[in-house]
């Protein structure tokens, strides 16, 4: 059964810098909880044709990663995501080609937004996924997957704040 999750976060940083950070897959481990021990492997970048430079993962790029699924568990899983859509400084989308879910579609959206007179960027993550396994997957989603996803995206928001405040948003990897 298809599940939906949406996460929003406003950050006091320019749209172009935030998009550049998220558009570079080497930054993914910096956003993830340390216990996940995310390791990138077999990253194949297809630069967007209309951009002169940058480390953006355009349409057709693939990102392989291995990571721990739940805190305290010793085993790792791996996944491969393919970028299926990319519009510079607006959004990009990835789908799981290989991994733990029956289906996974993640849309990353970015929009300039002023709050309390401060220029910033609204980051929106929309995820549609199916854990598979029928009724067992539905129970697993309610007990483990959805709560862990909520915690992971909360961590991503805190990590992004820390990266911005430390002045390291424009550094990669």
Outline where the language-model segments fall.
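Beta-strand/loop substructures that line and gate deep hydrophobic ligand-binding cavities in soluble
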Residues: 93-151
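Short, surface-exposed coil-to-beta transition loops
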Residues: 4-6, 76-80, 102-106
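Beta-strand elements of well-folded, non-transmembrane domains
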Residues: 11-13, 67-71, 85-87, 100, ...
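Glycine-rich portal/gate segments that line the openings of hydrophobic small-molecule binding cavities
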Residues: 40-97, 158, 163, 167-171
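Hydrophobic ligand-binding cavity/cleft-lining segments
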Residues: 1-52
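Hydrophobic pocket/interface hotspot
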Residues: 17-22, 28, 63, 83, ...
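A non-catalytic, amphipathic alpha-helix used as a structural packing/dimerization or gating element
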Residues: 151-159
């Amino acid at each position: 059964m298809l599940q939906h999750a949406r996460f929003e976060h406003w950050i006091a940083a320019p749209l172009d810098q935030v998009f550049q950070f998220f558009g570079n897959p080497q930054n993914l481990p910096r956003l993830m909880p340390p216990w996940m021990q995310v390791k990138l492997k077999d990253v194949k970048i297809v630069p967007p044709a209309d951009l002169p430079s940058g480390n953006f993962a355009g349409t057709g790029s693939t990102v392989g990663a291995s990571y721990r699924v739940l805190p305290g568990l010793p085993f790792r899983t791996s996944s491969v995501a393919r970028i299926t859509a990319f519009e510079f400084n607006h959004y990009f989308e990835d789908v799981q080609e290989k991994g733990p879910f029956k289906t996974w579609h993640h849309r990353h959206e970015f929009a300039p937004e002023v709050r309390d007179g401060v220029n910033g960027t609204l980051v929106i993550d929309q995820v549609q996924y199916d854990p598979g396994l029928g009724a067992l997957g539905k129970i697993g989603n309610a007990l483990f997957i959805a709560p862990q996803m909520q915690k992971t995206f909360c961590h991503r928001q805190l990590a992004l704040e820390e990266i911005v405040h430390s002045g390291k948003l424009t550094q990669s990897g």
